[in-house]
Design a protein with these regions (language model features):
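Long C-terminal interaction/binding lobes of large macromolecular proteins
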Residues: 1-60, 75-279
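Glycine-biased, low-complexity coil/linker segments
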Residues: 67-68
């Protein structure tokens, strides 16, 4: 089912002291086929393709940068790699809503009775639940935060996250913790709790109870891997739609993959439903 709507205005909470918003354009086949994985680099590359420039109020033409409200209302260039993981997660949640809707549905197997357990929730409700009160955090610049207690934190960008990942779990985590606090040996547990409150990620453990036997289990939900994997799982369908439109209309590959996803799907569905011609 298509979910093409007006682009959502997504608040970026760790960019500047004043409100900054971004919009994502609709997916195209070229975006879907370019996706190679579910890691941070793949997420950054996809978001950079989708970040739509704001409209200039005077000319109604797109201005080159996409960040709205940065620098007293003057947009300024920023790449997805510059954003905090929390802000990237907000964009990926908006992408999921635009593509499939706000509700997340999944099924997992109960380890106790082997029956399937349905998991369903709304992304927007989860985001509201995780979002800290405004007075809790003060944004002093790009990824620069100060808590209500006066503690300063420098959130990592995508490159820092990728570099830490190459060091292994413990060394990489220590590297990130030191860069965030500026201290050589920060209290990792306390830092984790603080960051969950100041810059929450859509990477959580949810309680799933089995309707058959009542057993409970914790299920991890990560918006990045969930959304990107869902796109990867649809690759064969995208290729089928491309083939159908190329065969039915004689269009080139470039023409087809440049179509908005909702239009491509609607045209492919019409072609599939059309009765065979006589002759």
């Amino acid at each position: 089912m298509a979910h093409a709507t007006a682009p959502e205005r997504v608040p970026l909470r760790h960019v500047a002291a004043q409100p900054v918003f971004a919009r994502l354009r609709e997916l195209r086949g070229s975006d879907e086929l370019a996706l190679q994985g579910v890691d941070t680099r793949s997420a950054v590359q996809l978001l950079d393709r989708l970040l739509a420039p704001p409209l200039d109020a005077r000319t109604l033409a797109p201005s080159p940068p996409w960040g709205e409200g940065w620098g007293e209302g003057r947009p300024r260039q920023c790449a997805a790699a510059d954003l905090s993981a929390s802000d990237r997660d907000a964009l990926l949640a908006a992408l999921h809503r635009a593509t499939w809707g706000d509700r997340i549905t999944s099924s997992i197997r109960c380890p106790a009775c082997e029956q399937m357990v349905d998991l369903s929730f709304e992304l927007s409700a989860l985001q509201r639940q995780l979002q800290p009160p405004p007075a809790t955090v003060h944004v002093e610049g790009l990824r620069a935060l100060r808590s209500a207690q006066g503690e300063s934190f420098a959130l990592p960008d995508a490159q820092a996250e990728e570099e830490a990942a190459t060091l292994g779990l413990h060394a990489g985590l220590a590297r990130l913790q030191a860069s965030i606090t500026g201290a050589d040996s920060p209290d990792g547990a306390q830092l984790g709790t603080t960051l969950e409150a100041l810059a929450p990620l859509l990477d959580v453990e949810l309680d799933a109870a089995c309707a058959e036997c009542g057993a409970s289990q914790l299920v991890r939900f990560d918006i990045q891997s969930f959304t990107l994997q869902r796109l990867l799982d649809e690759r064969e369908r995208v290729l089928g739609e491309v083939h159908a439109l190329a065969s039915g209309y004689g269009w080139s590959l470039d023409e087809i993959v440049s179509l908005p996803r909702s239009l491509r799907r609607a045209l492919a569905a019409r072609l599939t439903a059309a009765p065979p011609a006589f002759g």
